[in-house]
Amino acid sequence: MTMRRLMTWLFGAFLLLLREDAFALGLLDGYHLALENDPQFQAAIQEHEAGRQYRALGRAALLPRLVYSYNRGRSWSDVTQTTTRGDFKEDRDYDSYVSTLSLQQPLFDYEAFSRYRKGVAQALLSDERFRSQSQELLVRVLEAYTGALLAQDQIELARAQKRSYREQFQLNQRQFERGNGTRTDTLETQARFNLAQAQEIEARDSQDAALRELERLVGAPLEIADLAPLGERFQVRPLSPASYTAWRDLALAENPELASLRHAVDVARYEVEQNRADFLPRLGLYASTGKSKSGSENTYNQRYETDSVGIQLSVPLFSGGETLAATRQATHRMEKSHYDLDDKVRETLNQVRKMYNQSSSSAAKIRAYEMTVDSARTLVMATRKSIAAGVRVNLDLLNAEQALYSAMNELSKAKYDYLTAWARLRFYAGVLDEADLELVAANFVSGETPARRRDCATTDCPAPLHTLSKTDTEENRSALN
Protein backbone atom coordinates (compact mmCIF):
# COMPACT_ATOMS: atom_id res chain seq x y z
CA MET A 1 0.00 0.00 0.00
CA THR A 2 1.46 3.36 -1.01
CA MET A 3 1.75 6.21 1.47
CA ARG A 4 -0.86 8.22 -0.44
CA ARG A 5 -3.41 5.41 -0.30
CA LEU A 6 -2.65 4.84 3.36
CA MET A 7 -3.25 8.51 4.18
CA THR A 8 -6.50 8.45 2.20
CA TRP A 9 -7.69 5.38 4.10
CA LEU A 10 -6.75 6.90 7.45
CA PHE A 11 -8.58 10.10 6.59
CA GLY A 12 -11.69 8.14 5.64
CA ALA A 13 -11.53 6.25 8.94
CA PHE A 14 -11.05 9.54 10.76
CA LEU A 15 -14.21 10.93 9.17
CA LEU A 16 -16.17 7.85 10.19
CA LEU A 17 -15.00 8.14 13.81
CA LEU A 18 -15.75 11.85 14.11
CA ARG A 19 -18.92 12.01 12.05
CA GLU A 20 -21.18 11.85 15.11
CA ASP A 21 -19.19 14.70 16.67
CA ALA A 22 -20.15 17.04 13.83
CA PHE A 23 -16.72 17.05 12.23
CA ALA A 24 -16.69 19.56 9.38
CA LEU A 25 -14.64 19.18 6.22
CA GLY A 26 -13.87 22.75 5.26
CA LEU A 27 -13.70 23.93 1.69
CA LEU A 28 -9.92 24.36 1.89
CA ASP A 29 -9.57 20.93 3.49
CA GLY A 30 -11.42 19.44 0.56
CA TYR A 31 -9.18 21.27 -1.91
CA HIS A 32 -5.99 20.09 -0.19
CA LEU A 33 -7.24 16.51 -0.25
CA ALA A 34 -8.17 16.85 -3.92
CA LEU A 35 -4.63 17.98 -4.72
CA GLU A 36 -3.40 14.60 -3.51
CA ASN A 37 -6.27 12.29 -4.40
CA ASP A 38 -8.11 13.54 -7.49
CA PRO A 39 -7.18 11.10 -10.29
CA GLN A 40 -7.86 13.70 -12.97
CA PHE A 41 -5.44 16.16 -11.39
CA GLN A 42 -2.82 13.46 -10.79
CA ALA A 43 -3.07 12.55 -14.47
CA ALA A 44 -2.59 16.24 -15.31
CA ILE A 45 0.60 16.28 -13.23
CA GLN A 46 2.03 13.34 -15.16
CA GLU A 47 0.97 14.86 -18.46
CA HIS A 48 2.72 18.08 -17.50
CA GLU A 49 5.91 16.26 -16.54
CA ALA A 50 5.83 14.46 -19.87
CA GLY A 51 5.21 17.71 -21.74
CA ARG A 52 8.22 19.38 -20.15
CA GLN A 53 10.46 16.94 -22.03
CA TYR A 54 9.52 18.42 -25.41
CA ARG A 55 12.09 21.17 -24.92
CA ALA A 56 14.91 18.66 -24.36
CA LEU A 57 13.73 16.52 -27.27
CA GLY A 58 13.78 19.50 -29.62
CA ARG A 59 17.16 20.74 -28.40
CA ALA A 60 18.72 17.30 -28.92
CA ALA A 61 18.51 17.70 -32.71
CA LEU A 62 20.86 20.72 -32.54
CA LEU A 63 23.48 19.14 -30.30
CA PRO A 64 26.37 16.92 -31.42
CA ARG A 65 25.92 13.17 -31.61
CA LEU A 66 28.75 10.98 -30.34
CA VAL A 67 28.63 7.31 -31.29
CA TYR A 68 31.02 4.50 -30.45
CA SER A 69 30.85 1.21 -32.31
CA TYR A 70 32.88 -1.96 -31.89
CA ASN A 71 32.82 -5.12 -33.96
CA ARG A 72 34.89 -8.23 -33.28
CA GLY A 73 34.64 -11.54 -35.09
CA ARG A 74 36.42 -14.55 -36.54
CA SER A 75 36.60 -15.31 -40.23
CA TRP A 76 37.36 -18.38 -42.31
CA SER A 77 38.05 -18.06 -46.02
CA ASP A 78 39.61 -19.93 -48.95
CA VAL A 79 41.66 -17.59 -51.12
CA THR A 80 42.71 -18.54 -54.67
CA GLN A 81 45.30 -16.39 -56.42
CA THR A 82 45.89 -16.77 -60.15
CA THR A 83 49.40 -16.08 -61.40
CA THR A 84 51.50 -16.97 -64.46
CA ARG A 85 52.71 -19.95 -62.53
CA GLY A 86 49.21 -21.17 -61.89
CA ASP A 87 46.64 -20.97 -59.12
CA PHE A 88 47.67 -20.80 -55.51
CA LYS A 89 45.19 -21.60 -52.72
CA GLU A 90 45.39 -20.39 -49.16
CA ASP A 91 43.20 -21.14 -46.18
CA ARG A 92 42.80 -18.15 -43.88
CA ASP A 93 41.61 -18.42 -40.30
CA TYR A 94 41.90 -15.13 -38.48
CA ASP A 95 40.38 -12.76 -35.90
CA SER A 96 39.21 -9.28 -36.88
CA TYR A 97 37.91 -6.20 -35.11
CA VAL A 98 36.84 -2.66 -35.94
CA SER A 99 36.57 0.06 -33.29
CA THR A 100 35.20 3.50 -34.25
CA LEU A 101 34.35 6.69 -32.35
CA SER A 102 32.45 9.22 -34.46
CA LEU A 103 31.11 12.72 -33.84
CA GLN A 104 28.49 14.55 -35.91
CA GLN A 105 27.44 18.18 -35.47
CA PRO A 106 24.78 19.89 -37.60
CA LEU A 107 25.95 23.20 -39.03
CA PHE A 108 22.89 24.05 -41.08
CA ASP A 109 19.80 21.91 -40.53
CA TYR A 110 16.58 23.91 -40.75
CA GLU A 111 14.49 20.87 -39.86
CA ALA A 112 16.40 20.41 -36.60
CA PHE A 113 16.06 24.10 -35.78
CA SER A 114 12.30 24.00 -36.48
CA ARG A 115 11.99 20.89 -34.35
CA TYR A 116 13.71 22.70 -31.49
CA ARG A 117 11.37 25.70 -31.71
CA LYS A 118 8.39 23.35 -31.89
CA GLY A 119 9.63 21.56 -28.77
CA VAL A 120 9.86 24.84 -26.88
CA ALA A 121 6.31 25.73 -27.94
CA GLN A 122 5.05 22.28 -26.92
CA ALA A 123 6.64 22.63 -23.48
CA LEU A 124 5.05 26.06 -23.01
CA LEU A 125 1.70 24.64 -24.15
CA SER A 126 2.03 21.92 -21.52
CA ASP A 127 2.76 24.51 -18.82
CA GLU A 128 -0.32 26.56 -19.67
CA ARG A 129 -2.55 23.51 -19.92
CA PHE A 130 -1.44 22.41 -16.45
CA ARG A 131 -2.06 25.90 -15.09
CA SER A 132 -5.59 25.69 -16.46
CA GLN A 133 -6.16 22.25 -14.93
CA SER A 134 -4.83 23.48 -11.58
CA GLN A 135 -7.32 26.35 -11.54
CA GLU A 136 -10.09 24.08 -12.77
CA LEU A 137 -9.57 21.83 -9.75
CA LEU A 138 -10.42 24.77 -7.48
CA VAL A 139 -13.67 25.30 -9.39
CA ARG A 140 -14.59 21.61 -9.40
CA VAL A 141 -14.13 21.33 -5.63
CA LEU A 142 -16.15 24.49 -5.01
CA GLU A 143 -19.02 23.45 -7.29
CA ALA A 144 -19.27 19.96 -5.80
CA TYR A 145 -19.11 21.39 -2.27
CA THR A 146 -21.74 24.08 -2.82
CA GLY A 147 -23.90 21.73 -4.87
CA ALA A 148 -24.22 19.36 -1.93
CA LEU A 149 -25.01 22.20 0.48
CA LEU A 150 -27.58 23.76 -1.84
CA ALA A 151 -29.32 20.41 -2.13
CA GLN A 152 -29.34 20.17 1.67
CA ASP A 153 -31.02 23.57 1.88
CA GLN A 154 -33.61 22.40 -0.62
CA ILE A 155 -34.19 19.21 1.37
CA GLU A 156 -34.76 21.20 4.54
CA LEU A 157 -37.13 23.58 2.77
CA ALA A 158 -39.08 20.65 1.38
CA ARG A 159 -39.31 19.15 4.87
CA ALA A 160 -40.53 22.46 6.26
CA GLN A 161 -43.19 22.59 3.56
CA LYS A 162 -44.26 19.04 4.34
CA ARG A 163 -44.59 19.84 8.02
CA SER A 164 -46.62 22.95 7.31
CA TYR A 165 -48.84 21.12 4.81
CA ARG A 166 -49.27 18.21 7.23
CA GLU A 167 -50.51 20.57 9.92
CA GLN A 168 -52.76 22.33 7.42
CA PHE A 169 -54.10 18.98 6.22
CA GLN A 170 -54.98 17.95 9.75
CA LEU A 171 -56.72 21.30 10.25
CA ASN A 172 -58.67 20.82 7.01
CA GLN A 173 -59.78 17.39 8.15
CA ARG A 174 -61.03 18.68 11.50
CA GLN A 175 -62.89 21.53 9.82
CA PHE A 176 -64.42 19.13 7.30
CA GLU A 177 -65.61 16.82 10.09
CA ARG A 178 -67.20 19.80 11.85
CA GLY A 179 -68.84 20.98 8.67
CA ASN A 180 -66.73 24.15 8.42
CA GLY A 181 -64.52 22.97 5.56
CA THR A 182 -64.73 21.27 2.20
CA ARG A 183 -63.25 18.19 0.63
CA THR A 184 -61.57 20.45 -1.90
CA ASP A 185 -59.46 22.07 0.84
CA THR A 186 -58.18 18.65 1.90
CA LEU A 187 -57.34 17.61 -1.66
CA GLU A 188 -55.52 20.88 -2.36
CA THR A 189 -53.35 20.50 0.73
CA GLN A 190 -52.64 16.85 -0.05
CA ALA A 191 -51.53 17.78 -3.57
CA ARG A 192 -49.11 20.40 -2.21
CA PHE A 193 -47.76 17.89 0.31
CA ASN A 194 -47.11 15.34 -2.42
CA LEU A 195 -45.36 17.98 -4.52
CA ALA A 196 -43.09 18.91 -1.60
CA GLN A 197 -42.30 15.23 -1.08
CA ALA A 198 -41.31 14.88 -4.73
CA GLN A 199 -39.12 17.98 -4.46
CA GLU A 200 -37.39 16.48 -1.43
CA ILE A 201 -36.65 13.27 -3.30
CA GLU A 202 -35.26 15.24 -6.24
CA ALA A 203 -33.07 17.31 -3.92
CA ARG A 204 -31.74 14.14 -2.27
CA ASP A 205 -30.79 12.74 -5.65
CA SER A 206 -28.95 15.97 -6.48
CA GLN A 207 -27.20 15.93 -3.13
CA ASP A 208 -26.11 12.33 -3.55
CA ALA A 209 -24.62 13.12 -6.97
CA ALA A 210 -22.77 16.15 -5.58
CA LEU A 211 -21.41 14.17 -2.62
CA ARG A 212 -20.24 11.35 -4.88
CA GLU A 213 -18.44 13.89 -7.07
CA LEU A 214 -16.81 15.41 -3.99
CA GLU A 215 -15.81 11.92 -2.81
CA ARG A 216 -14.18 11.31 -6.18
CA LEU A 217 -12.17 14.48 -5.74
CA VAL A 218 -11.03 14.04 -2.12
CA GLY A 219 -10.69 10.25 -2.21
CA ALA A 220 -12.67 9.61 0.99
CA PRO A 221 -16.30 8.74 1.85
CA LEU A 222 -18.42 11.74 2.83
CA GLU A 223 -21.85 12.59 4.17
CA ILE A 224 -23.56 15.95 4.20
CA ALA A 225 -22.88 16.23 7.95
CA ASP A 226 -19.15 16.35 7.16
CA LEU A 227 -19.39 19.66 5.27
CA ALA A 228 -19.17 23.13 6.77
CA PRO A 229 -22.41 25.03 6.07
CA LEU A 230 -22.85 28.54 4.78
CA GLY A 231 -22.69 31.12 7.56
CA GLU A 232 -25.41 33.59 8.50
CA ARG A 233 -23.21 36.61 7.81
CA PHE A 234 -22.97 36.23 4.07
CA GLN A 235 -21.25 39.07 2.27
CA VAL A 236 -21.03 39.92 -1.41
CA ARG A 237 -17.60 41.32 -2.19
CA PRO A 238 -17.31 44.19 -4.66
CA LEU A 239 -15.54 43.19 -7.84
CA SER A 240 -11.96 44.32 -8.26
CA PRO A 241 -11.41 45.48 -10.94
CA ALA A 242 -14.91 46.86 -11.22
CA SER A 243 -15.30 47.22 -15.01
CA TYR A 244 -15.97 44.46 -17.51
CA THR A 245 -13.33 45.91 -19.84
CA ALA A 246 -10.64 45.28 -17.24
CA TRP A 247 -11.79 41.67 -16.78
CA ARG A 248 -11.88 41.18 -20.54
CA ASP A 249 -8.32 42.46 -20.94
CA LEU A 250 -7.22 40.31 -18.01
CA ALA A 251 -8.72 37.21 -19.60
CA LEU A 252 -7.08 37.91 -22.95
CA ALA A 253 -3.72 38.29 -21.25
CA GLU A 254 -3.85 35.65 -18.50
CA ASN A 255 -6.36 32.93 -19.42
CA PRO A 256 -4.30 29.70 -19.57
CA GLU A 257 -6.57 28.03 -22.13
CA LEU A 258 -6.07 30.91 -24.53
CA ALA A 259 -2.35 30.91 -23.83
CA SER A 260 -2.13 27.17 -24.52
CA LEU A 261 -3.98 27.59 -27.83
CA ARG A 262 -1.61 30.40 -28.82
CA HIS A 263 1.26 28.01 -28.21
CA ALA A 264 -0.65 25.39 -30.22
CA VAL A 265 -0.64 27.85 -33.13
CA ASP A 266 3.14 28.17 -32.72
CA VAL A 267 3.49 24.38 -32.67
CA ALA A 268 1.51 24.14 -35.90
CA ARG A 269 3.57 26.90 -37.52
CA TYR A 270 6.86 25.20 -36.66
CA GLU A 271 5.41 21.94 -37.97
CA VAL A 272 4.97 23.67 -41.31
CA GLU A 273 8.56 24.90 -41.20
CA GLN A 274 9.79 21.45 -40.24
CA ASN A 275 8.16 19.93 -43.31
CA ARG A 276 9.29 22.79 -45.54
CA ALA A 277 12.87 22.16 -44.41
CA ASP A 278 12.94 19.01 -46.53
CA PHE A 279 13.32 21.31 -49.55
CA LEU A 280 16.55 22.76 -48.13
CA PRO A 281 20.10 21.37 -48.08
CA ARG A 282 21.75 20.16 -44.89
CA LEU A 283 25.33 20.76 -43.88
CA GLY A 284 27.08 18.95 -41.06
CA LEU A 285 30.50 18.47 -39.55
CA TYR A 286 31.81 15.02 -38.79
CA ALA A 287 34.94 13.65 -37.14
CA SER A 288 35.93 10.09 -36.40
CA THR A 289 38.78 7.98 -35.11
CA GLY A 290 39.06 4.24 -35.43
CA LYS A 291 41.22 1.18 -35.11
CA SER A 292 40.90 -2.00 -37.11
CA LYS A 293 42.65 -5.28 -37.73
CA SER A 294 41.88 -7.48 -40.69
CA GLY A 295 38.70 -5.56 -41.21
CA SER A 296 38.29 -7.09 -44.68
CA GLU A 297 40.01 -9.49 -47.06
CA ASN A 298 41.92 -6.56 -48.52
CA THR A 299 43.33 -5.68 -45.10
CA TYR A 300 44.15 -9.22 -44.00
CA ASN A 301 46.78 -9.26 -41.26
CA GLN A 302 46.96 -5.46 -41.34
CA ARG A 303 46.32 -2.98 -38.55
CA TYR A 304 44.96 0.52 -39.19
CA GLU A 305 44.53 3.60 -37.01
CA THR A 306 42.46 6.15 -38.91
CA ASP A 307 41.44 9.71 -37.98
CA SER A 308 39.19 11.76 -40.24
CA VAL A 309 37.35 15.08 -40.16
CA GLY A 310 35.20 16.77 -42.77
CA ILE A 311 31.87 18.24 -43.76
CA GLN A 312 28.87 16.51 -45.22
CA LEU A 313 26.36 18.15 -47.55
CA SER A 314 23.07 16.60 -48.60
CA VAL A 315 20.72 18.23 -51.09
CA PRO A 316 17.18 16.86 -51.57
CA LEU A 317 16.21 16.65 -55.22
CA PHE A 318 12.92 14.78 -55.47
CA SER A 319 10.83 12.85 -52.93
CA GLY A 320 7.86 11.87 -55.04
CA GLY A 321 5.78 14.84 -53.86
CA GLU A 322 5.83 13.75 -50.21
CA THR A 323 7.44 16.95 -48.94
CA LEU A 324 4.99 19.19 -50.77
CA ALA A 325 1.97 17.19 -49.56
CA ALA A 326 3.22 17.15 -45.96
CA THR A 327 3.78 20.90 -46.06
CA ARG A 328 0.28 21.55 -47.38
CA GLN A 329 -1.22 19.27 -44.74
CA ALA A 330 0.65 21.05 -41.96
CA THR A 331 -0.44 24.42 -43.36
CA HIS A 332 -4.11 23.45 -43.18
CA ARG A 333 -3.64 22.25 -39.62
CA MET A 334 -2.06 25.57 -38.75
CA GLU A 335 -5.06 27.41 -40.19
CA LYS A 336 -7.33 25.18 -38.11
CA SER A 337 -5.40 26.08 -34.97
CA HIS A 338 -6.03 29.77 -35.71
CA TYR A 339 -9.77 29.15 -35.93
CA ASP A 340 -9.69 27.07 -32.75
CA LEU A 341 -8.05 29.99 -30.98
CA ASP A 342 -10.59 32.48 -32.32
CA ASP A 343 -13.46 30.25 -31.20
CA LYS A 344 -11.98 29.84 -27.72
CA VAL A 345 -11.44 33.59 -27.39
CA ARG A 346 -15.09 34.27 -28.17
CA GLU A 347 -16.29 31.51 -25.85
CA THR A 348 -14.06 32.74 -23.03
CA LEU A 349 -15.16 36.36 -23.39
CA ASN A 350 -18.79 35.25 -23.38
CA GLN A 351 -18.19 33.35 -20.15
CA VAL A 352 -16.33 36.31 -18.64
CA ARG A 353 -19.27 38.55 -19.47
CA LYS A 354 -21.76 36.06 -18.07
CA MET A 355 -19.84 35.54 -14.81
CA TYR A 356 -19.20 39.28 -14.51
CA ASN A 357 -22.91 40.03 -14.82
CA GLN A 358 -23.80 37.36 -12.28
CA SER A 359 -21.18 38.56 -9.82
CA SER A 360 -21.93 42.27 -10.15
CA SER A 361 -25.70 41.79 -9.88
CA SER A 362 -25.61 39.28 -7.03
CA ALA A 363 -25.73 41.86 -4.24
CA ALA A 364 -28.92 43.43 -5.58
CA LYS A 365 -30.39 40.02 -6.38
CA ILE A 366 -29.75 38.67 -2.87
CA ARG A 367 -31.19 41.81 -1.26
CA ALA A 368 -34.28 41.50 -3.46
CA TYR A 369 -34.79 37.87 -2.48
CA GLU A 370 -34.33 38.74 1.21
CA MET A 371 -37.04 41.37 0.89
CA THR A 372 -39.20 38.86 -0.98
CA VAL A 373 -38.81 36.35 1.84
CA ASP A 374 -39.80 38.95 4.43
CA SER A 375 -42.81 40.02 2.39
CA ALA A 376 -43.87 36.43 1.74
CA ARG A 377 -43.58 35.57 5.42
CA THR A 378 -45.78 38.54 6.31
CA LEU A 379 -48.25 37.48 3.63
CA VAL A 380 -48.49 33.99 5.12
CA MET A 381 -49.33 35.35 8.56
CA ALA A 382 -51.81 37.84 7.12
CA THR A 383 -53.50 35.15 5.04
CA ARG A 384 -53.97 32.95 8.10
CA LYS A 385 -55.68 35.80 9.91
CA SER A 386 -57.84 36.48 6.86
CA ILE A 387 -58.91 32.83 6.72
CA ALA A 388 -59.88 32.98 10.39
CA ALA A 389 -61.95 36.07 9.60
CA GLY A 390 -63.59 34.33 6.65
CA VAL A 391 -62.07 36.63 4.03
CA ARG A 392 -59.58 34.20 2.44
CA VAL A 393 -59.76 30.48 1.69
CA ASN A 394 -57.40 27.51 2.08
CA LEU A 395 -55.97 27.84 -1.44
CA ASP A 396 -54.82 31.39 -0.71
CA LEU A 397 -52.77 30.13 2.23
CA LEU A 398 -51.26 27.32 0.18
CA ASN A 399 -50.25 29.77 -2.53
CA ALA A 400 -48.75 32.15 0.03
CA GLU A 401 -46.72 29.36 1.64
CA GLN A 402 -45.57 28.14 -1.76
CA ALA A 403 -44.40 31.65 -2.63
CA LEU A 404 -42.51 31.87 0.67
CA TYR A 405 -40.65 28.59 0.22
CA SER A 406 -39.93 29.39 -3.41
CA ALA A 407 -38.40 32.73 -2.39
CA MET A 408 -36.33 31.05 0.33
CA ASN A 409 -35.07 28.51 -2.18
CA GLU A 410 -34.14 31.23 -4.68
CA LEU A 411 -32.35 33.16 -1.94
CA SER A 412 -30.27 30.13 -1.01
CA LYS A 413 -29.52 29.39 -4.66
CA ALA A 414 -28.52 33.01 -5.32
CA LYS A 415 -25.88 32.87 -2.58
CA TYR A 416 -24.27 29.71 -3.89
CA ASP A 417 -24.52 30.95 -7.47
CA TYR A 418 -22.67 34.10 -6.47
CA LEU A 419 -19.80 32.13 -4.94
CA THR A 420 -19.36 29.93 -8.00
CA ALA A 421 -19.80 32.87 -10.41
CA TRP A 422 -17.15 34.89 -8.55
CA ALA A 423 -14.73 31.97 -8.65
CA ARG A 424 -15.46 31.22 -12.30
CA LEU A 425 -14.95 34.86 -13.24
CA ARG A 426 -11.44 34.69 -11.84
CA PHE A 427 -10.98 31.28 -13.47
CA TYR A 428 -11.84 32.60 -16.94
CA ALA A 429 -9.65 35.62 -16.26
CA GLY A 430 -6.80 33.20 -15.48
CA VAL A 431 -6.05 34.54 -12.00
CA LEU A 432 -7.86 32.07 -9.71
CA ASP A 433 -5.65 30.66 -6.94
CA GLU A 434 -5.84 29.19 -3.44
CA ALA A 435 -5.99 32.64 -1.85
CA ASP A 436 -9.27 33.24 -3.68
CA LEU A 437 -10.62 29.95 -2.34
CA GLU A 438 -9.72 31.12 1.16
CA LEU A 439 -11.92 34.18 0.64
CA VAL A 440 -14.78 31.95 -0.48
CA ALA A 441 -14.20 29.56 2.43
CA ALA A 442 -14.65 32.46 4.87
CA ASN A 443 -18.37 32.34 4.06
CA PHE A 444 -18.65 28.85 5.53
CA VAL A 445 -18.85 28.06 9.24
CA SER A 446 -16.08 25.69 10.33
CA GLY A 447 -16.84 23.18 13.06
CA GLU A 448 -20.60 23.06 12.38
CA THR A 449 -22.81 20.72 10.42
CA PRO A 450 -25.24 21.83 7.72
CA ALA A 451 -28.27 22.26 10.00
CA ARG A 452 -30.92 24.69 8.92
CA ARG A 453 -30.40 28.17 10.37
CA ARG A 454 -33.08 30.07 8.50
CA ASP A 455 -36.39 31.50 9.59
CA CYS A 456 -39.45 29.42 8.88
CA ALA A 457 -43.01 30.28 8.11
CA THR A 458 -43.97 28.76 11.45
CA THR A 459 -42.49 29.40 14.87
CA ASP A 460 -41.49 25.75 15.34
CA CYS A 461 -39.08 24.80 12.58
CA PRO A 462 -38.54 21.12 11.80
CA ALA A 463 -35.24 19.62 12.84
CA PRO A 464 -32.79 18.79 10.04
CA LEU A 465 -33.15 15.34 8.56
CA HIS A 466 -30.09 13.67 7.00
CA THR A 467 -31.70 10.47 5.72
CA LEU A 468 -35.08 9.70 4.26
CA SER A 469 -36.05 6.58 6.17
CA LYS A 470 -38.88 4.14 5.63
CA THR A 471 -40.46 5.38 8.87
CA ASP A 472 -40.56 8.93 7.56
CA THR A 473 -42.29 7.80 4.40
CA GLU A 474 -44.88 5.83 6.34
CA GLU A 475 -45.54 8.81 8.62
CA ASN A 476 -46.03 11.04 5.60
CA ARG A 477 -48.55 8.62 4.15
CA SER A 478 -50.44 8.21 7.44
CA ALA A 479 -50.76 11.96 7.83
CA LEU A 480 -52.62 12.15 4.55
CA ASN A 481 -54.79 9.07 4.90
UniProtKB/Swiss-Prot annotation:
UniProt GO MF annotations: efflux transmembrane transporter activity; porin activity
One GO term (biological process): secretion
Record's subcellular location: Cell outer membrane
Family matches, as InterPro entries: Bacterial_OMF, OMP_efflux, T1SS_OMP_TolC
Region (Disordered): 462-481
GO cellular component, one term: efflux pump complex
A Pfam family of this chain: OEP
Alphabetically ordered keywords of this record: Cell outer membrane, Membrane, Transmembrane, Transmembrane beta strand, Transport
SUPFAM superfamilies referenced in this protein's UniProt entry, alphabetically: Outer membrane efflux proteins (OEP)
Chief site of localization: membrane
Domain of life: Bacteria
Basic and acidic residues bias (residue ranges): 469-481
Family: Belongs to the outer membrane factor (OMF) (TC 1.B.17) family.
Protein purpose: Involved in the secretion of alkaline protease.
PANTHER family linked: OUTER MEMBRANE PROTEIN TOLC
The protein's name in its UniProt record: Alkaline protease secretion protein AprF
Organism this protein belongs to: Pseudomonas aeruginosa (strain ATCC 15692 / DSM 22644 / CIP 104116 / JCM 14847 / LMG 12228 / 1C / PRS 101 / PAO1)
Gene transcribed to yield this protein: aprF
